[in-house]
Amino acid sequence: MLNNPFCYTPAPSIVEAARALAARIDATPSLRALFAEGKMLGVLEVERSLSSSDVRLAPEKRSLRRTPPAASLASEKAQRRMASGCEGFFSPEQTDDRASGARPSMFLYAFSGLAGGSAFVEGFVPPIYAYKPDSIRATSPEHSRQLQDWLFDQYIVVNGRGERRSIRQIFADRGLVPPGGTGECAAPKLLQYALLHGLTPVAIGEFWYGASPEREVRRSGAFYPACTGKCGPLLAYMLEGLDVEPNPLESDAHWQLADPVVRYEDRDLIVAEKPAGMLAVPGRPVPGVAPRRSLQDWLADYCGAPVLACHRLDMDTSGLMVFAKSPEAQAALQEQFEKREVSKAYLAWVSDPSGKASLPEPGTRGKIVLPLAPDWYDRPRQQVDPDQGKPAVTDYEVLRLRDDGAAFVRLIPYTGRTHQLRVHCAHKDGLGLPIIGDRLYGGAPAPRLMLHAAHLSFRHPADGRRMTFASSQSFD
């Protein structure tokens, strides 16, 4: 069963293939020059389900009569490379388990976008569709939109049932318009090539190679889930008909959730500890997916009446939350959060998965000031944005170190931006050490995100007295 590209722990075979690819790039000056500035690379393990001469779903021939005057297709040589057989795109470390009766596994490699201005690099699968970017010149915003529409009509992809559809149609079926660059990520390139050549996908992973970008949190060697904006609708279509693991984030069963713990309750409010993996408040309905139970739902049942949210906590994060029992109490508590009169502190385990970074000594304190903004094409990820980002400030203190290269830290946010602590820990201009278990920002694999809301202090909405709650977390 193929792992879900939107939430996964990379298979050992994928990790080894990625390391082999990175080593090959490091040892090849021409490749190192192409990728040194930073690039998302993809690895797909496949089984040859058909003989090399029995290729199904061969790429369609496009008619140049459909090409607008301002655009042209790639060269005939490039087109032949797109329609060529499988040779040249497999890792030399192929596995052959004929003695055990298993089919041999092979690895396909791809990169996102262009490398050195080219869509073709020897040893990597070709793009879904090729054109010469320099030949496409938009003369007006309307012309630009028409060219974009035309291009996405040419991007014909296949799914596991052998069906074909253009990228524009796939997004239109969902009431969406494909963002620029859709179809150029590594994962859709890999799946397209495999499905066109009778190969069965076994495992997939995307990892970053090279320098970290200024805005996004990307660490060389770290694996990341497929993006949601460009690849969400596209991969959902391409994976139809394949045996794919369900997204564990869409099911409470994955988390084996413990019940929340109520820490305090009176007629105005209730304070509880949320377990990791539970939604703080109900999420948006997803067609075909059963709604997940949130802490707000659980507390409503516990109290026998609705409770009202006053703040948020990431699904992956555990710890203290306060809910109001009346609109008046909710307004008073929310005002404290908005005026930053609520005191909060978190505990986290952080590390450098590569093992190359030196850890700060216990007792080290510091302040991280990095403005944050949404990554619009990969929600819910956030990125550092000095131009449009909102101010975000976090104090940190290193409490102790572990022999395995992890550090236990206290984090005190003075602003409440989405994923603030996760980005401030992981970004190269922040702590530079992602939180362990952070699947979005390159943390070392773990059963859960090692982040816990351990301290919460506010004034009671009715009588104004200061209320302070503390919670320890072993992260067992």
What role is predicted for each listed range?
Residues 1-476:
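RNA pseudouridine synthases
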